[in-house]
């Protein structure tokens, strides 16, 4: 049925399958993910210079969305979908379409992974939108569960999720949520003493 309906030789617009089963009044925004050019998962994430530039990600939103939802640039906010929610920091950008929010994915990591300490920005401020995306569509009226994927290629529908955003409470911790227990060291993986790179030699009392 999917191939018969959507596998057309000419491109045409159709409403994403997940959106048809989502309350778009409650979840009015489209959420997208991109990748920073310099880093993806472990690729280049151990470069000390790059980590100073972008050691964690933000949720980029239009200033109009922030004004409508009562939060400012740099605030901690919640981004919520029908499947889950994430607490993160926001960043205003006029380049973001008001009906859309987006972030760099693959920067948020659990403490302990790749030698990151519990104080690392990746673990305390970085986040993933994966927690908001389901592998299955909401059940139909008959209770049927269908894969949340492109109807033709089968690619996971990462760009189809709908969300809402709102300001985090003043008493909430200034760390991303959800948080996970630090990953244990693997056998033979010992703690290493940190070493400064050459470009910071002479700082912090180091000669």
Predicted regions mapped to residue ranges:
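Long, low-complexity segments enriched in small/aliphatic residues
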Residues: 1-47
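Long, contiguous, secondary-structure-rich segments that constitute the structural scaffold
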Residues: 44-60, 64-207
